[in-house]
């Protein structure tokens, strides 16, 4: 977008813009600083420990809701994908840094599940569905409707359940293996039984 387009869209005088900013990049930089720390909004107000199953599901649902309701976030993501500059690189890095403590908590607690990679796929899907919603339905799901939104919300709940069921199964197998070992059952038999 050119400065002249921005000034027209914002309905401000060029002098007002140039008194505050030297160029469009400076404006974008300032704009992003005000709007891009939305990840904390996603985790605020969660009633469950953020490193629990219900906390995880709540984070995914809140992310979907925030992107559904706040088009500014979508525009920032769209810009980040479309252009590579200092501002877009920095905001991508900052978003990653804000998420890092949460990622590390899940990674530590759920070692047998690559929850980080699974989460990356889910979050990427949430981003894409929301970026795409103004174009057309995706997989016959229309995020512009309440029905479509509810379907995605339910799917996020199901995905969260599946991820944690896998971890619970791994934990159970580990407990059973330990008890079998305590009762003198060989490693080979334990492996055959639990694979």
Language-model region placement:
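Phosphate/oxyanion-binding loops and surfaces in catalytic or ligand/nucleic-acid-binding neighborhoods
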Residues: 34, 38, 66, 70, ...
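Long, positively charged, glycine-interspersed low-complexity recognition regions
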Residues: 183-195
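Amphipathic alpha-helical interaction segments
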Residues: 5, 58, 76, 117-124
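Short secondary-structure transition hinges
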Residues: 41, 65-104, 143-146
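Helix-turn-helix
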Residues: 1-26, 30
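Alpha-helical DNA-contacting segments of helix-turn-helix folds
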Residues: 28-35, 91
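Hydrophobic alpha-helical connector segments
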Residues: 30, 43-73, 112, 119
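Hydrophobic/aromatic-rich alpha-helical bundle segments in the mid-to-C-terminal region
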Residues: 104-159, 163-176, 187-188
């Amino acid at each position: 977008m050119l400065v002249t387009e921005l000034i027209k869209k914002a309905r401000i005088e060029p002098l007002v813009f140039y008194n505050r900013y030297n160029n469009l990049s400076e404006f974008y930089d300032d704009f992003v600083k005000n709007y891009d720390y939305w990840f904390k909004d996603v985790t605020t107000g969660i009633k469950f420990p953020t490193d629990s199953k219900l906390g995880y599901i709540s984070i995914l649902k809140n992310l979907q809701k925030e992107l559904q309701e706040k088009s500014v976030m979508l525009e920032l993501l769209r810009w980040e994908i479309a252009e590579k500059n200092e501002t877009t690189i920095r905001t991508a890095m900052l978003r990653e840094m804000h998420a890092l403590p949460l990622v590390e908590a899940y990674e530590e607690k759920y070692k047998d599940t690559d929850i980080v990679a699974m989460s990356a796929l889910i979050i990427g899907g949430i981003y894409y569905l929301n970026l795409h919603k103004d174009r057309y339905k995706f997989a016959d799901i229309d995020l512009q409707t309440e029905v479509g939104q509810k379907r995605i919300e339910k799917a996020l709940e199901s995905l969260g359940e599946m991820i944690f069921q896998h971890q619970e199964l791994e934990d159970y197998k580990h407990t059973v293996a330990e008890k079998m070992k305590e009762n003198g059952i060989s490693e080979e038999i334990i492996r055959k039984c639990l694979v």
